[in-house]
Amino acid sequence: QLGEHAKKYPAQLSGGQRQRIAIARALIAQPKVLLMDEPFSALDALTRENLQNTVLDLCEQQQLTLVIVTHSIEEAIFLGQKIAVFSDHSGTLRHIGENRHSGQANYRGTAEFYEHCNLLRSWIGGQVHEN
């Protein structure tokens, strides 16, 4: 689906387009595990959500395990079937939790989604927001 973008230099592409290319490059090797470190952090909210959905679809189609490192609580809650919280300095595992609603399109914006966000905030030690 490169279309008109096929002959462009990377600097001429948007952040979302560059991110899609990076994901495609990673998938060429047909990995069993897709490891992503802050893959959506520099993107606007709508592009971020679209790419999150794309990655989840690809993982399902290709039967990939997704391991993602993120500082975004909402991203962790939406994408993570299992969510691990590590300590700031020593890197020791502080909490791990299951998320049976991960990746469900109608999950974002629900009361349960925000409850899980608040639970994750409490695990991290951050302030819990009232909704």
Q: Where are the language model's segments positioned?
A:
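Conserved ABC ATPase "signature" region
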Residues: 1-4, 57
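Hydrophobic anchor residue at the start of the ABC signature
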Residues: 23
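Catalytic Walker B motif of ABC-type/P-loop ATPase nucleotide-binding domains
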Residues: 34-37
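Helical segment within the ABC ATPase nucleotide-binding domain
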Residues: 48-62
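Conserved H-loop
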Residues: 63-69
